[in-house]
Amino acid sequence: MMSQQDLPTLFYSGKSNSAVPIISESELQTITAEPWLEISKKGLQLEGLNFDRQGQLFLLDVFEGNIFKINPETKEIKRPFVSHKANPAAIKIHKDGRLFVCYLGDFKSTGGIFAATENGDNIQDIIEDFSTTYCIDDMVFDSKGGFYFTDFRGYSTNPLGGVYYVAPDFRTVTPIIQNISVANGIALSKDEKVLWVTETTANRLHRIALEDDGVTIQPFGATIPYYFTGHEGPDSCCIDSDDNLYVAMYGQGRVLVFNKRGYPIGQILIPGRDEGHMLRSTHPQFIPDTNQLIICSNDIEMGGGSMLYTVNGFAKGHQSFQFQ
């Protein structure tokens, strides 16, 4: 009979040495991002990257509510204002220059959206927290000036979240899909016929084909082209001018890239991820008129700071509503 010390034994080697091993996507084209700018030596939950018409970068930190403005040429960091609403999660810029800020509130039922100037003045409630039960995480404008937003509620066995469309007059809210678990990132294809949505706690990517009215789903048009693996799950996303989709993987320190049909075609790794550093990658966004992608992440679990990283993507970023 074989002694215990002679039994076959598992060892940590190869992929099992990583804090966040990549299994199903290990054969994809893979590049590692370069550090671009340190936002803070403190771990801040960075999110909401968006560029204005002058090429200035806006972003926020969720838990403290700081709104940051960065000059990409000088790397100067300013903090023009602090959100008056709890747990802001995304910034989108209207073509009139106003910032639309999504906020999560109490993470249960007090989220909403407000608009303000870049200095935080002239605040207008777009979706009020006291008259709805949404927990709003992200949004994307269409060319008419309406927008889609994600409802971040629920968990894996209690899918309360969904996706809604708000008409350009901001008065009518129409449900697109419902009963999903923590709807998070959202992006709209160049022709505005395909809506992409990430479902974080179910680890799924939704591809929703829309009719011309922008709210009716085409027959058999709501599909799930991809199931992610690992903890935690897909976060914010954006498209490039080839209609490729870039999805930040929260808790994994990487960005996955999909073609317009939802097939994975590449991935971007954050340095230090195998050792468990900078895993909270939340949002990718292109510098306008370039293929240079900026990615935000932080190292809260390991006591590190908050960083922006950069790579070149497959194509230039898509010039969305604020540039039209």
Curated annotation (Swiss-Prot):
Keyword vocabulary terms for this entry: Calcium, Cytoplasm, Hydrolase, Metal-binding
Cofactor note: Binds 2 Ca(2+) ions per subunit.
Residues that bind Ca(2+) 2: S109, G111, D129, T132, Y134
Pfam families given in the database record: SGL (PF08450)
InterPro entries: 6-blade_b-propeller_TolB-like (IPR011042), SGL (IPR013658), SMP-30/CGR1_Lactonase (IPR051262)
Location in or out of the cell: Cytoplasm
GO CC aspect terms: cytoplasm
Principal subcellular localization: cytoplasm
Protein name as it appears in the record: Lactonase drp35
Catalytic activity, EC: 3.1.1.-
Top-level EC class: hydrolase
Family: Belongs to the SMP-30/CGR1 family.
GO molecular function, one term: metal ion binding
Purpose: Exhibits lactonase activity. Acts in cells with perturbed membrane integrity and is possibly related to the membrane homeostasis.
SUPFAM superfamilies: Calcium-dependent phosphotriesterase
Annotated gene: drp35
Positions that bind Ca(2+) 1: E47, D137, N184, D235, S236
Cofactor: Ca(2+)
Active site, renumbered: D235 (proton donor)
